Regions:
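Transition segments tied to proteolytic processing and entry into folded domains
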Residues: 8-167
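Bacterial N-terminal signal peptides
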Residues: 1-5
Length: 167
């Protein structure tokens, strides 16, 4: 006699959003957003890590100070030099946590508040895109200048949550 048991495989299913999708979302947001293409440096050891021993430790976002050097999206192009501190707000969803590589170049969308700039780091990517090949910046410029704004979203978003969803 053979006894088999089924275990549920855990997997995070992310909606494949591209820079054009996020550009449209933040453009429609009431919150002021900055679009930055540049190098982000921070202490990677501060990124949240899920632990079975303490699963509740990653329920709240982790704020991480970071330095950014790059260009801010202006009226027609990425032409405004930016250098300074931002706050990375790293989120986890169950055992999956957002992560970045310190020193890498990203195109990212950051919320401007009264006293700081906050960039959300999610398990599914969300607001950060690699800027190493320049394609993310090209896509955002195309959207920004009123051209075709390509989407990577599936035809149906039934049950999906956007990066700006309220908790």
């Amino acid at each position: 006699m053979t006894i088999t048991t089924a275990t549920q495989a855990l997997a995070l299913s992310c909606v494949p959003m591209g820079p054009g999708d996020v550009y449209r979302i933040v453009s429609d947001s009431e919150d002021p957003f900055l679009v930055i293409e540049g190098r982000v440096s921070f202490d990677e050891t501060l990124l949240p890590q899920y632990s079975d021993a303490n699963p509740r430790a990653t329920e709240k976002p982790t704020e991480i100070p970071a330095q950014v050097t790059g260009l801010l999206l202006g009226e027609r192009m990425f032409d405004q030099p930016v250098e300074g501190e931002i706050t990375l707000e790293a989120h986890c969803l169950g055992p999956w946590c957002g992560s970045l590589v310190s020193g890498a170049r990203y195109l990212f969308f950051a919320r401007q508040t009264e006293d700081r700039v906050v960039a959300v780091v999610e398990p599914c990517g969300g607001f950060f895109f690699s800027a190493e090949d320049g394609s993310a910046g090209d896509t955002v410029l195309q959207c920004h200048l009123g051209g075709i704004c390509p989407s990577q979203l599936p035809a149906s978003l039934e049950g999906a949550v956007t990066p700006l969803a309220e908790d």
